[in-house]
């Protein structure tokens, strides 16, 4: 063997080793697990992220995602209870496979488990839902419930068939319906919109009328309250005037009563003082003072009884009687029957 052949052999060996290494070394991304098949049999030990070595051409691997992933089911036919065929353009299923369940699910449903457990189940559940409802219900009335119904149905079956596979959310696009039916629905929606607008306008008008009525009621109540307040104010003014008049009358009556009491008290005191002051001796003194201050002289038979006390008058009367007895009868009485003193007084 010459040098050229030796070099070719070495190059062939190196190339074969390189090919074998390239075929045996593989990389697993983060969030994935690698399951291995050797001779078609699934090995029991999956590998995590990183570089791994396997027997080339004997062992193969499949990468299985264990983080959130979205599976899309497109153009799903669906027949309603009325016989109308509709198509749902896209259904998105957000799911996640737990790492501990990778081996069992891959063994039972292969590495393409989503086609068996999700895609087929979506078709089945959606057709059941459509066949039980009319086009009106599927397209309008119950469309918002399709997502939740599909999610619950999928998760219920997966809990039994594939524990560890969780459905996070289901999103369904609006169904495609025949063009003629779609136009009818659009016209119906337009009419419904007009009806809603008319109803809203009517509600607005009713609300405005109600607001106007409440405003009128409030205004009337305000006027009534103002009138009531003014009336109460006038009543209070009249009551105040009446009270003031009563107070003034009471004050005047009290003053008059006090004045009358004072006058009565003064008169009573004056009478009491006079009672104590006007004794017989004092009256006698005042009488003599009055006689002494009087410059007129009175003559007559009644003078002694007027200005002389009774004792003096009796003495004077007794003396005069004795003198008359000693006089002759002619001298004792004049022809006229009057005394000489009276005649002199009359003459004078």
UniProtKB/Swiss-Prot annotation:
Coiled coil: none annotated. Residues 29-348 are lumenal. GO terms for molecular function: cholesterol binding; ubiquitin protein ligase binding. Keywords: Acetylation, Cholesterol metabolism, Endoplasmic reticulum, Glycoprotein, Lipid metabolism, Lipid-binding, Membrane, Signal-anchor, Steroid metabolism, Sterol metabolism, Transmembrane, Transmembrane helix. Its main location: endoplasmic reticulum. Residues 318-348 are annotated as: Disordered. Residues 1-7 are cytoplasmic. The chain crosses the membrane at residues 8-28. SUPFAM superfamilies: Band 7/SPFH domain (SSF117892). The modification N6-acetyllysine is found at residue 269. One of its GO terms (cellular component) is protein-containing complex. One of its GO terms (biological process) is negative regulation of fatty acid biosynthetic process. It is found in: Endoplasmic reticulum membrane. InterPro entries: Band_7, Band_7/SPFH_dom_sf, Erlin1/2. Glycans are attached at residue 108. It is a single-pass type II membrane protein. Deubiquitinated by USP25; leading to stabilization. Residues 318-336 have a biased composition (Basic and acidic residues). Residues 339-348 have a biased composition (Polar residues). Belongs to the band 7/mec-2 family. Component of the ERLIN1/ERLIN2 complex which mediates the endoplasmic reticulum-associated degradation (ERAD) of inositol 1,4,5-trisphosphate receptors (IP3Rs). Involved in regulation of cellular cholesterol homeostasis by regulation the SREBP signaling pathway. Binds cholesterol and may promote ER retention of the SCAP-SREBF complex. Forms a heteromeric complex with ERLIN2. In complex with ERLIN2, interacts with RNF170. Interacts with AMFR and SYVN1. This is Erlin-1.
């Amino acid at each position: 063997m010459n040098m050229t052949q030796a070099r070719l052999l070495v190059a062939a060996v190196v190339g074969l080793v390189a090919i074998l290494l390239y075929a045996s070394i593989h990389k697993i991304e983060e969030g994935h697990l690698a399951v291995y098949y050797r001779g078609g049999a699934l090995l029991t030990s999956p590998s995590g992220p990183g570089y791994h070595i396997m027997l080339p051409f004997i062992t193969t691997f499949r990468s299985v995602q264990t983080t959130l992933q979205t599976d899309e089911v497109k153009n799903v036919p669906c027949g309603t209870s009325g016989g109308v065929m509709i198509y749902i353009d896209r259904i998105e299923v957000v799911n996640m496979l737990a790492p501990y369940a990778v081996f069992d699910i891959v063994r039972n449903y292969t590495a393409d488990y989503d086609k068996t457990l999700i895609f087929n189940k979506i078709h089945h559940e959606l057709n059941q839902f459509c066949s039980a409802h009319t086009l009106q219900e599927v397209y309008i009335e119950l469309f918002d419930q399709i997502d939740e119904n599909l999610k619950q149905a999928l998760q219920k079956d997966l809990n039994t068939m594939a524990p560890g596979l969780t459905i996070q959310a289901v999103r369904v696009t609006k169904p495609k319906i025949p063009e003629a039916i779609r136009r009818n629905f659009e016209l119906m929606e337009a009419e419904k919109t007009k009806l809603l607008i008319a109803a809203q306008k009517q509600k607005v008008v009713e609300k405005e009328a109600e607001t106007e009525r409440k405003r009128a009621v409030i205004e009337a109540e305000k006027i009534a309250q103002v009138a009531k307040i003014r009336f109460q104010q006038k009543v209070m003014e009249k009551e105040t005037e009446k009270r003031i008049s009563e107070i003034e009358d009471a004050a005047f009556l009290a003053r008059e009563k006090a004045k009358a009491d004072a006058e009565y008290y003064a008169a009573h005191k004056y009478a009491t003082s006079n009672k104590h002051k006007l004794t017989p001796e004092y009256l006698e003194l005042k009488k003599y003072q009055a006689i002494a201050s009087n410059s007129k002289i009175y003559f007559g038979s009644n003078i002694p009884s007027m200005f002389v006390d009774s004792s003096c008058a009796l003495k004077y009367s007794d003396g005069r009687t004795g003198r008359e007895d000693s006089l002759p009868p002619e001298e004792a009485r004049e022809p006229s029957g009057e005394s000489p003193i009276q005649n002199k007084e009359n003459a004078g």
